[in-house]
A protein has these predicted regions:
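N-terminal glycine/serine-rich phosphate-binding loop of ATP-dependent small-molecule kinases
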Residues: 1-91, 118, 209, 221-228, ...
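Active-site core segments that coordinate phosphate-bearing ligands/cofactors
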Residues: 4-6, 102, 109-171, 181-183, ...
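Short, acidic/turn-prone active-site loops that include or flank metal/cofactor-
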Residues: 30, 35, 94-101, 177, ...
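Residues that line or immediately flank small-molecule/substrate-binding pockets and catalytic motifs
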Residues: 32, 74, 97, 211, ...
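Short, conserved phosphate/pyrophosphate- and ester-handling motifs at nucleotide-, phospho-/glycolipid
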Residues: 45, 98, 232
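Short beta-strand-loop/turn "lid" adjacent to the catalytic site in phosphate-handling enzymes
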Residues: 62-96, 123-129, 158, 162-183, ...
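A conserved helix-loop-beta module that forms one wall/lid of the active-site cleft
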Residues: 191, 197-212
Length: 484
């Protein structure tokens, strides 16, 4: 038996096959263009995203016989508006990183803000989907016309892909929990929240489970069931082998995303982390998690490269000592504001402590350290099991300097996975569950334990200096009014 997992991510779309022997192999990877039409705005061509999924699906169906089911991982908060009659997008996809709606959210009445937090567990932030959906209805004439005509699809990107592939208008509970429109306890669209954001409830797709016989994809003369669909970070959580309370993972991708399983009901976290649905299998109750992220991690590395301070990630692999922080140089990776636990879109990215003898190497090192220190801040706000190391993956985790500094800043071991494609692996494993089978563990699913070095106490003692740098980035942002 084989499961085809498609991971539609922020920078590319990847397809993998996982068989019942535990072998995970790549079908293909297609990159897509990212658009920045104005400051704070981030968009994708939704047609390009869908075409890439379809191309990889067709390739897999040609090359891989006996595909028993298909699993789809999505970007989470990214949204699309489309014509349900011809399945064509009416506007570019608005990406989770987009900040255009923050000013609208800042103007919400206090009672509305309280209602959003109480019902969804989420802060009123442009990161989440609801304000993006509202913006499309208010600002794109074709979208408003389609709503009046009764043929509008308006939802997170997974719904667009599923509608296009199956003609079913649906999303799953993990993705719906990222919109700010779903009651987190009842796991249904909330009418009051829809009124707050100006998004008619009857425009939204139905909410279903993350696994099970969800829909049927008819393509290339074959009918194959869609057996799993969920947010990419929740798929990665499953791929890490996290199953019980206290199990946690951190993914160092475009942003840093840390999740920890909390149990069968959502909990309120007083440290700025947000409750979310981890997954829900068909016929079962939901499992919940706490989630926190940093908007710009690998994105900050890419930005540093674009400035000419490095040619690739390999240039960031520097000798372990002395750290930039020990030399008085800090970098705050708030290029799109600060997410958990601060939730401050006015914060700005900055290097602090530049001198005449500061080199590009020092600045590169400070970037890695800033990402690691922000990530450690996230982990320490999660209810992580004390007897298990945090499990890590993502492109930045492959950099020895970075992952060692992260372990030192955290002061505890980090379990670094050998398998880099944890999102695809988790989605595929979810696919096996959707077919009523036990997850097929990947044959290369080992790990290396990264233990804190002797420098850890010294680095941890400097955490307060970094916290002050973060506070300075927030104060400077408020002074200059940088938030959209």
């Amino acid at each position: 038996m084989k499961i085809l997992a498609i991971d539609q991510g922020t920078t590319s779309t990847k397809a993998f096959i996982l068989d019942d022997e535990g072998e995970l192999r790549l079908v293909g990877r297609l990159h897509h263009e990212r658009f920045h039409p104005a400051p704070g705005r981030v968009e994708h061509d939704a047609e390009e995203l869908a075409s890439n999924i379809e191309s990889l699906l067709d390739q897999a169906l040609r090359d891989e016989p006996e595909i028993a089911g298909i699993a789809l991982a999505n970007q989470g908060e990214t949204v699309v508006a489309w014509d349900r009659r011809n399945k064509k997008p009416l506007y570019r996809a608005i990406v989770w990183q987009d900040q255009r709606t923050q000013s609208m959210l800042d103007e919400l009445r206090p009672d509305a803000r309280d209602s959003i937090r109480a019902r969804t567990g989420l802060p009123p932030d442009a990161y989440f989907s609801a304000s993006k959906l509202s913006w499309l209805l208010r600002n794109v004439p074709q979208v408003a016309e389609a709503a009046r005509g009764g043929y509008l699809g308006l939802a997170t990107s997974d719904s667009f892909f599923i509608d296009r592939l199956t003609n079913e208008y649906m999303t799953d509970v993990t993705t719906a929990s990222r919109t700010s429109l779903m009651d987190l306890h009842a796991r249904v669209w909330d009418r009051e929240l829809c009124l707050i954001f100006g998004v008619p409830l009857d425009l939204l797709p139905r909410i279903g489970a993350s696994t099970g016989p969800l829909a049927v994809i008819s393509r290339s003369g074959k009918c194959i069931p869609l057996v799993a669909t969920l947010v990419d970070q929740q798929a990665a959580l499953f791929g890490h082998g996290c199953r019980v309370c206290g199990d946690a993972k951190v993914t160092f991708g475009t942003g840093t995303f840390a999740l920890a399983i909390t149990g069968q009901s959502p909990i309120v976290n007083q440290k700025g982390m947000v409750p979310t649905v981890a997954w829900q299998h068909s016929g079962e109750g939901a499992l919940y998690a706490l989630d926190g992220g940093d908007y710009t991690s690998a994105a900050a590395v890419d930005w540093t490269i674009s400035l000419g301070l490095a040619r690739s990630l390999a240039d960031f692999d520097l000798p372990p000592e002395p750290s930039a922080l020990e030399q008085g140089l800090a970098f705050v990776p708030a290029l799109a504001g600060l997410a958990a636990p601060h939730w401050d879109r006015t914060a700005t990215g900055m290097w602090i402590g530049l001198r005449q003898d500061t080199t590009a190497a020092h600045m590169r090192r400070a970037v890695l350290e800033g990402i690691a220190l922000r990530s450690a801040e996230l982990i320490e706000a999660l209810p992580v099991s004390g007897d298990k190391p945090i499990s890590a993956d993502g492109g930045l985790a492959s950099n020895p300097s970075f992952i060692q500094f992260f372990a030192d800043a955290l002061g505890s071991p980090v379990q670094l996975k050998f398998t880099h494609e944890l999102t695809s692996l988790g989605a595929a494993e979810m696919g096996f569950v959707g077919l009523g089978r036990s997850p097929s563990r990947c044959t290369s699913d080992g790990y290396r334990l990264i233990c804190p070095s002797p420098a850890s106490p010294r680095i941890r003692s400097l955490r307060s200096s970094f916290s002050k740098a973060v506070q300075m980035s927030r104060e400077f942002g408020r002074l200059t009014g940088t938030a959209d």
